[in-house]
Amino acid sequence: MDLLIYGVNGHMGSLIKNLAEKDSYWRVIGGVDSEMSDDPMNNRYDVVVDFSHPSALQDVLQLCKEKKIPLVIGTTGFSKEQLEDIKFASAKIPILQSTNMSLGMNLLFRLVEQTAAVLKDKSDIEVIESHHNRKKDAPSGSARTIVESIEKGLGEEKKHQHGRVGECPREKGEIGIHAIRGGNIVGYHEANFINDLETIKIVHEAHNRSVFAQGALDAAKFIMDQEPGLYTMKDLLNLMV
């Protein structure tokens, strides 16, 4: 199959390219970034993987819609309007979008949702994420997805408390969200469900960024067989169970 990578010279794009080159499943591997292009409009690709920048979204969607190419989106930091654009495009092409391509991390999303559904309001919930000192956004997209998964399990949205300073007693029902930045931490996320008798701690730690690249290639293989619609890594997990 022929693969096109948007953001091919970025950290994730280059990892995906290197892994794909070692997998005989991929026959042609093309790349697009801000400095070079394989002229995707003049070539036919079987799937596109996007790890570029939110500013490139319209170009990516236009290409995939015109050429009817399935799309995997790993880019984060989209505006609400851009998320709506993705949803609209998924009516014409299959799109898999995920804030984290690690299968293990997506298992964590499922586990925190199930835990929240059982415990309801019986625990204080705190989410902690740690990343390298070059990461620009906080909290991470994965931390946001953890909170969304928790709220889905609870059946309602909660107040989000981003860090604490000074006198700020914990409000009942709020979800604390905390970000740590330092060194070369690849990615660490934990969800804590705490009450007076016990703490349930659900943790995922990525040891190497290749785990995200492999997940992206797994997602690419999955999305090529799907009908138009908006998918997540949870759909891929369901297929594996």
Swiss-Prot record:
EC number, UniProt record: 1.17.1.8
Residues reported in the UniProt entry to bind (S)-2,3,4,5-tetrahydrodipicolinate: H132, G141, S142
NAD keyword on record: yes
SUPFAM superfamilies the record matches: Glyceraldehyde-3-phosphate dehydrogenase-like, C-terminal domain (SSF55347), NAD(P)-binding Rossmann-fold domains (SSF51735)
Residues the record lists as binding NAD(+): G7, V8, N9, G10, H11, M12, G74, T75, T76, S98, T99, N100, M101
Pathway: Amino-acid biosynthesis; L-lysine biosynthesis via DAP pathway; (S)-tetrahydrodipicolinate from L-aspartate: step 4/4
Listed GO MF terms: 4-hydroxy-tetrahydrodipicolinate reductase; NAD binding; NADP binding; oxidoreductase activity, acting on CH or CH2 groups, NAD or NADP as acceptor
GO cellular component: cytosol
BP GO terms, sorted: diaminopimelate biosynthetic process; lysine biosynthetic process via diaminopimelate
Record family assignment: Belongs to the DapB family.
Name of the protein this chain belongs to: 4-hydroxy-tetrahydrodipicolinate reductase
Organism: Alkaliphilus oremlandii (strain OhILAs)
